[in-house]
């Protein structure tokens, strides 16, 4: 049974009873079922900086961080809470992430063009050959019953420029899964969080990496099999947020990995111990044997 408890707090404006209204639902293990923020009437008079923008005061932003962080870091499958946590802590890391994008020609072009990956994007990718980035992205989405627009929109970041930086990271996250053949399961989501922290220094990824494994049944096995690979790959590879993925849809995914200086996890016994990962790799091998994979020199 889930009990919804509305809690009203008035901070910094005692005349406004609606200043802050977080809606928190508790289950038996205190899992947040919904967490929404309604701005104070004073903030509603401000000009919205982009469609869907919800301006928050510092106090509201702090409460959003705490409320979403308590459960979000423990349950990385709660995309809504992870999204809220990442936005409420954006001031810590987004400027640095934006600077990383500005350091490469490809990253600067992304910020100039501001491309977005939508459901319409993937329709034309279905015709590409197996083994291309675009087609494997479509196959990965289909295998998990996901779609590009299932990601939460950016709402709480004031700067339109930084809001797009966050949107870009959010929309390309599933491409990282595709690049490394990682299925959308908790152990592999956590592995990717470790990699993202190593690659982009994301605080949310760090928190998820530290607390998320508490929910794993095979913590020690996961730590041994995935953490060293994720840390090394993230550290040694190119910053993934600077990749203009849309210009690489037709590129062989193995060729792309070599260009970015990254590799999949080929440590001894990893495939045998992780069935979801093994299944993706086996499908690729079978397509290669049939000659239905793009011709590229890569160990498989």
Swiss-Prot record:
Membrane topology, from the record: Peripheral membrane protein
Cofactor(s) required for function per UniProt: Zn(2+)
EC number, UniProt record: 4.1.1.130
Main subcellular location of this protein, as a coarse class: mitochondrion
A single BP term in Gene Ontology: ubiquinone biosynthetic process
Catalysed conversion reaction: a 4-hydroxy-3-methoxy-5-(all-trans-polyprenyl)benzoate + H(+) = a 2-methoxy-6-(all-trans-polyprenyl)phenol + CO2
Principal EC category: lyase
UniProt-annotated binding residues for Zn(2+): 173-174, 177, 189
Domain of life (superkingdom): Eukaryota
Pfam families, per database record: Coq4
Claim: Zinc is one of the keywords in the record: yes
Function, in words: Lyase that catalyzes the C1-decarboxylation of 4-hydroxy-3-methoxy-5-(all-trans-polyprenyl)benzoic acid into 2-methoxy-6-(all-trans-polyprenyl)phenol during ubiquinone biosynthesis.
Protein family per UniProt: Belongs to the COQ4 family.
Other information: This protein may be expected to contain an N-terminal transit peptide but none has been predicted.
Subunit note: Component of a multi-subunit COQ enzyme complex, composed of at least COQ3, COQ4, COQ5, COQ6, COQ7 and COQ9.
Protein name per the record: Ubiquinone biosynthesis protein COQ4, mitochondrial
Organism of provenance: Cryptococcus neoformans var. neoformans serotype D (strain B-3501A) (Filobasidiella neoformans)
């Amino acid at each position: 049974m889930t009990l919804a408890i509305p809690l009203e707090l008035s901070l910094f404006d005692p005349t406004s009873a609606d200043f802050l209204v977080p809606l928190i639902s508790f289950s038996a293990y205190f899992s947040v079922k919904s967490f929404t923020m309604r701005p104070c009437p004073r903030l509603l008079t401000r000009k919205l900086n982009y469609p869907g923008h919800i301006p928050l005061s510092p106090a509201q932003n702090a409460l959003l961080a705490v409320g979403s962080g308590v459960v979000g870091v423990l349950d990385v499958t709660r995309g809504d809470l992870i999204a809220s946590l990442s936005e409420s802590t954006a001031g810590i890391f987004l400027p640095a992430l934006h600077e990383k994008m500005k350091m490469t020609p490809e990253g600067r072009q992304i910020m100039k063009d501001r491309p977005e990956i939508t459901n319409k994007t993937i329709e034309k990718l279905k015709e590409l050959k197996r083994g291309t980035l675009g087609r494997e992205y479509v196959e990965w989405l289909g295998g998990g019953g996901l779609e590009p627009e299932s990601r939460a929109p950016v709402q709480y970041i004031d700067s339109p420029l930084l809001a797009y930086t966050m949107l870009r990271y959010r929309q390309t996250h599933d491409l990282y899964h595709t690049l490394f053949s990682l299925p959308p399961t908790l152990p592999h989501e956590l592995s990717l969080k470790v990699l993202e922290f190593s690659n982009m220094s994301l605080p949310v990824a760090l928190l998820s990496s530290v607390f998320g494994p508490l929910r794993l049944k095979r913590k020690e096995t996961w730590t041994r099999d995935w953490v060293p690979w994720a840390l090394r790959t993230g550290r040694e590879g190119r910053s993934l947020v600077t990749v203009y993925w849309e210009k690489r849809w037709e590129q062989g995914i193995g060729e792309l990995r070599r260009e970015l200086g990254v590799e999949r996890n080929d440590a001894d016994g990893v495939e045998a111990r992780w069935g979801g990962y093994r299944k993706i790799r086996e499908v690729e091998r079978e397509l290669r044997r049939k000659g239905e994979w793009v011709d590229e020199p890569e160990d498989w």
